[in-house]
Curated annotation (Swiss-Prot):
Originating organism: Rhodopseudomonas palustris (strain BisB5)
Gene3D superfamilies according to UniProt: 1.10.286.20, DNA helicase RuvA subunit, C-terminal domain, Elongation factor Ts, dimerisation domain
Protein name: Elongation factor Ts
Gene assigned in the entry: tsf
InterPro entries: EF-Ts_dimer_sf (IPR036402), Transl_elong_EFTs/EF1B (IPR001816), Transl_elong_EFTs/EF1B_dimer (IPR014039), Transl_elong_Ts_CS (IPR018101), UBA-like_sf (IPR009060)
Role of this protein: Associates with the EF-Tu.GDP complex and induces the exchange of GDP to GTP. It remains bound to the aminoacyl-tRNA.EF-Tu.GTP complex up to the GTP hydrolysis stage on the ribosome.
NCBIfam families tied to this protein: tsf
Positions of region (Involved in Mg(2+) ion dislocation from EF-Tu): 80-83
PROSITE patterns: EF_TS_1, EF_TS_2
Keywords: Cytoplasm, Elongation factor, Protein biosynthesis
Disulfide pairings: none
Length: 308
């Protein structure tokens, strides 16, 4: 049987919002398997989490830059928020975004790209030597359309084009570029607020959908629902799930009546003067998935995990 550590309890608690003892039991029942523990809690009705969302903070900045039909979003990490507020670091992030807009989203290519008499990697090394703190280009994403716009939005901007969260979204259209730009920014703000996982149900990971279906079915069985009704209930439940995680099916935050994003985009075609198709989006939140030491919390839950 796997040893249940304080860190494991902490991660499950952050992911589900469930109490420490229930998290410990869920991990024990599932031999320390985190995903199985999440599903176990959901089947018990203790967690309403639709997906694994335990994101640990890291420092640095998200940068986003667009130029008409193309755009990029990058994440550059530092060790402390103090450095993220440093003008040299901020300038570094803006420079890397400009390079990424030219060479694309491959991190290795960005690092190898020339900057003055050096490279991006060299510029990062110079900044490390000057500022005295480790930093790295963690990831990058790019979008491009043949006609239309790529729009961006930075949430909690520290400087123009960089902050704690960044979104780019691509709109394919032959319509008015200025109107597309306004719509694109509104959509980017929506994506920042709602964190969709895919454009539509077809874009979701089939394994995620399978797990969701299985969790729902098991939950209703435990509630005593008749077997011949469960499939229909689950299908209705999946429709609700899609409205939560698929961009085109989400309730548009800029519409008071809550019409779906897909319908809002369709309605905007008259103003734009041509059909509009959202071809993709990226949403980067600072520190997604990066482990960071939180020793105080670990000490707090050590007793619940049976450690000293």
């Amino acid at each position: 049987m796997a040893t249940i550590t304080a860190a494991m309890v902490k991660e499950l608690r952050e992911t589900t919002g469930v109490g420490m003892m229930d998290c410990k039991q869920a991990l024990a029942e599932n031999d320390g398997n985190m995903e199985a523990a999440v599903d176990w809690l959901r089947k018990k009705g203790l967690s309403k989490a639709a997906k694994k969302a335990g994101r640990v903070a890291a420092e640095g900045l998200i940068g986003a830059l667009t130029d008409g039909t193309k755009g990029v979003v990058i994440e550059v990490n530092s060790e402390t928020d103090f450095v993220a507020r440093n003008e040299q670091f901020q300038g570094l992030v803006k420079m890397i975004a400009q390079v990424a807009l030219k060479v694309g989203a491959d991190v290795d290519k960005i690092n190898a790209a020339p900057v003055g008499s050096s490279t991006v990697a060299g510029a990062i090394s110079d900044a490390i030597a000057t500022i005295g703190e480790n930093m790295t280009l963690r990831r990058a994403a790019a979008l491009e359309v043949t006609q239309g716009v790529v729009a961006s939005y930075i949430h909690n901007a520290v400087i123009d084009g960089a902050g704690k969260m960044g979104v780019i979204v691509a709109l394919e259209s032959t319509g008015k570029a200025d109107e597309l730009g306004v719509l694109g920014r509104q959509l980017a703000m929506h994506i920042a607020a709602t964190n969709p996982q895919a454009l539509d149900p077809a874009g979701l990971d089939p394994e995620v959908v399978r797990r969701e279906r299985e969790v729902m079915a098991d939950k209703y069985r435990q509630q005593g629902k008749p077997e011949n009704m469960i499939e229909k209930i689950v299908e209705n439940g999946l429709k609700t799930y899609y409205k939560e995680v698929c961009l085109l099916e989400q309730a548009y935050i800029h519409d008071e009546k809550g019409k779906a994003v897909g319908q809002a985009v369709k309605d905007a075609e008259g103003k734009v003067g041509a059909p509009i198709k959202i071809t993709g989006f990226f949403r980067y939140a600072l520190g997604e998935g990066i482990e960071k030491q939180t020793s105080d919390f670990a000490a707090e839950v050590a007793a619940a995990s049976g450690q000293k």
